[in-house]
């Protein structure tokens, strides 16, 4: 492994483990490349301590502050949207986002993008779409076989956010047995969401075993179409560590065997 990547991974590891013994001294000739690598993978907060007293520090500190601000903005958008749905009798399941960020030592350091919600009942999905559009959520046309995309703009701030409203947890596979297994696992009759409290608000989320199976498929889809970076791997590892005792690994292996992807 190149020294640059070795140093980068040391920063990631020490930050996620809260290892204060790691000195994090960065050779001057690596500073520009390491800063660019962290920016590319949206992991600037994890390497920030190593750039103290360098010319890169002010800009990287500002990016870290922006990322933390974005976390609370997404948190507010998530709460706003889920509250709207639940107050109108529409159950939904929070995927990824602040739910996964809660597994990090510092949740605000996990880069957040759009909001992903899963509604697995067709009638509830239809009701949600009518409600959202009536409340100012604008549908954005997108080719997708598993979600509908909406943009919502807060009038007071002018800040807009994207909502991906999922009717399937992941996109369709060409291999039909895989689609059948995924549909069965996350069907209304089989799936039993659990509750997770984040920043004082309680959401419905996937149970640990189903969550891990979902993350495997999510990573596989990224790998097949565009590849995935270290953030997805960090999500996976931190979630496993947090919920290890609650995950039925034998069941996950069984599901993978059913779809002919046990090698995943």
Give a label for each model feature:
Residues 1-113, 119-263:
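Conserved NTP-donor binding/palm subdomain of two-metal-ion nucleotidyltransferases/polymerases, i.e.
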